[in-house]
């Protein structure tokens, strides 16, 4: 059964007699989550899970069951469920969801596990992960947002889904309004040259953004 007690079909077990190594046919649980081996000889048997369903975690434990003449034996085993990880992306100022953001999910050994893109609700889900520590980082953000969100580490546990939240600010805009100093009427076709300067580098990096002209009134 699953960790929440619901029957779990589709799980395959291997039964072997320990005394002489006799192996019986592998059998798979049905819709009610059960398997029955009949007509067995008394003795001690090894029971081991061979495979499980995709959204659960394989149990590698080898269980021993002793059978006695005239007595049936029952063993109840559980599989933990794989956790899901949902990533949420929102506007840092308005809280509105931000679709179209690409996130990279990496495992503990830094190998890439998944690459997902947020949908219209600003979220993306990576399903059926193994328990462990994962790094979630932004790979790209849609315009007009800045890629300023730091990577986050998240620990996943069996039977527990997790959510992780990211926020981004929009790129700032500059509006220049040119007007007559006396009448305050707007002045058309005035040209301005704009340069961007960084305050995050020792050299004060500068970038020429170009020349812009005021629109018609």
Explain the meaning of each model-derived region.
Residues 1-217:
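Solvent-exposed loop/turn and edge beta-strand elements of beta-rich ligand-binding domains
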């Amino acid at each position: 059964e699953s960790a929440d007690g619901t029957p779990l079909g589709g799980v395959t077990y291997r039964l072997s007699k320990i005394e002489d190594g006799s192996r019986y046919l592998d059998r798979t649980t049905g819709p009610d989550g059960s398997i029955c081996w009949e007509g067995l000889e008394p003795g001690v048997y090894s029971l081991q899970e061979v495979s499980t369903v995709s959204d659960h975690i394989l149990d590698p434990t080898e269980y021993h069951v002793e059978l006695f003449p005239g007595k049936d034996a029952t063993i109840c085993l559980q599989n933990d469920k794989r956790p899901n990880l949902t990533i949420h992306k929102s506007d840092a100022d308005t809280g509105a969801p931000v679709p179209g953001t690409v996130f990279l999910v990496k495992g503990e050994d830094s190998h890439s596990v998944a690459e997902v893109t947020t949908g219209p609700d600003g979220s993306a889900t990576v399903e059926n992960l193994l328990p462990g520590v994962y790094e979630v980082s932004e790979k790209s953000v849609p315009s007009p947002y800045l890629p300023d969100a730091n990577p986050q580490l998240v620990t996943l546990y069996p039977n527990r889904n997790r959510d992780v939240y990211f926020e981004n600010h929009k790129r700032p805009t500059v509006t220049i309004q040119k007007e007559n100093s006396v009448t305050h009427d707007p002045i058309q076709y005035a040209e301005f040259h704009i340069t961007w300067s960084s305050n995050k580098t020792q050299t004060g990096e500068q970038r020429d953004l170009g020349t812009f002209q005021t629109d018609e009134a």
